[in-house]
Amino acid sequence: MEAKLTVNGFGFVARYGEKDVERVLLPLLMWLTELQAERDRRLIAFLAAPPGAGKSTLAAFMEWLSRRTPEATPLQAVGMDGFHCPNAYLDAHSFVDEDGREVGMRSRKGAPQTFDVEGLRAALADARSDAPAPWPTYSRVMHDVVAASLPIRKKILLVEGNYLLLDEGRWKGLAELADYTVFLSAPEALLRERLVARKVAGGSTPEEARAWYEASDGRNVARVLVHHSPADLELALGADGSLTVA
């Protein structure tokens, strides 16, 4: 099944197998619909995954699918990327990394320490209200945060992000703010291949892309795969792009 989608201002075509849609995604969509009706308020669901697993694409596809399934309640996909700390903040702050070295936040942008977790918690709590404040988004053109740019309108809010189920530091316990959680896993080797290819497609040389993976992306991948809390639904991404219930 193909869908023309837009994520972070970029258009692309997402493709999922018919069997994956019928056996995994439609049942998930209908379960969220049932939960929302049962609780009779805005439902918040998390879709967490390591970098490179395709969580943003999957969340956008789920929104698209919900609009084309008459018996489903339409959902809205939103990302936690809008809760990156602004570049000005990153440039002025540092943290101690996994090797015990103090590093500038900007050099590790995308690591768990470079997000406004308190702001995300507040936004999740507010999202249950009848008139929630708009969410910030992340511009892939400016490579920075755009404040209060996404109105929250639908009865089901599907929040996607790397660290939503991270079981350490300020992230621990964030899942308590969700009604339902999904974790999408993938083999580290597959994620490495996809992330390096993404960097090369963005203009980096293969050598630069591999170096960035070792210095940044790979560390984030390992952290999410090893240190995530159990989800209500665990999915696995195959090398062929297939989805299965783990």
Residue ranges and their predicted role:
Residues 1-24:
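Charged, amphipathic alpha-helical linker segments immediately N-terminal to NTP-binding catalytic cores
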Residues 26-38:
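Pre-Walker A adenine-sensing motif
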Residues 52:
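Walker A (P-loop) phosphate-binding loop of P-loop NTPases
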Residues 55:
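Conserved lysine of the Walker
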Residues 58:
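Hydrophobic positions on the alpha1 helix immediately C-terminal to the Walker A/P-loop
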Residues 76, 83-139:
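Conserved nucleotide-sensing/catalytic segment adjacent to the nucleotide-binding pocket
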Residues 142-198:
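ATP-dependent NMP and nucleoside kinases share a basic, alpha-helical "lid"
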Residues 145-148, 169-172, 197-246:
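Small-molecule kinase domains that catalyze NTP-dependent phosphoryl transfer to phosphate-bearing small molecules
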